[in-house]
């Protein structure tokens, strides 16, 4: 992590020490993101992935567009999914997929709601339900 912070000057967005994971903004908050995990500690057996900033509209449409191109969209845990997930600590909507060389890629859209790290990672529909319940209180 020191390399990315001190040498490259990346801004740390989030640290999950118990999972040996660190996330860095590239180009400032809300833009592209680099996620790093200790060997074998990351979801989907990854040690690195790159997240590209996208609009929420593009994120919501991505599973359908990827499927039409023969690419499987996946959830945070690597399971095939037809809807985005929401990462509560950011919060951001995300869709994961791999390129032809098996590199893990992510489309990411920051959401306007307040961060909810306590919910972890949930499906888009679960997130919308949580937001609606909170608004009703």
Predicted regions and their residues:
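Short, flexible turn/loop "capping" segments at secondary-structure junctions
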Residues: 42-44
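Core segments of cupin and vicinal oxygen chelate
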Residues: 1-32
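Short glycine-/small-residue motifs
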Residues: 33, 104-107
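Eukaryotic phosphotyrosine signaling hubs
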Residues: 46-50
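Vicinal oxygen chelate
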Residues: 51-100, 104, 111-118, 123-137
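Residue-level detector of high-confidence beta-strand sites
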Residues: 13-15, 76, 107
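Residue-level detector of conserved, well-ordered beta-strand and adjacent loop positions
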Residues: 25, 37, 98, 108
């Amino acid at each position: 992590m020191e390399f990315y912070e001190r040498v490259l000057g990346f801004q740390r967005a989030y640290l999950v020490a118990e999972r040996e994971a660190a996330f860095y903004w590239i180009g400032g908050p809300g833009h592209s993101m680099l996620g790093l995990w200790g060997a074998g500690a990351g979801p989907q057996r990854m040690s690195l992935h790159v997240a590209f900033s996208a609009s929420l509209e593009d994120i919501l449409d991505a599973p359908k567009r990827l499927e039409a191109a023969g690419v499987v969209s996946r959830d945070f845990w690597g399971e095939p999914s037809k809807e985005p997930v929401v990462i509560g600590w950011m919060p951001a909507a995300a869709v994961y997929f791999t390129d032809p060389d098996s590199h893990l890629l992510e489309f990411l859209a920051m959401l306007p709601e307040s961060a909810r790290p306590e919910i972890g990672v949930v499906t888009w529909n679960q997130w919308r339900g949580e937001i609606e319940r909170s608004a009703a209180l």
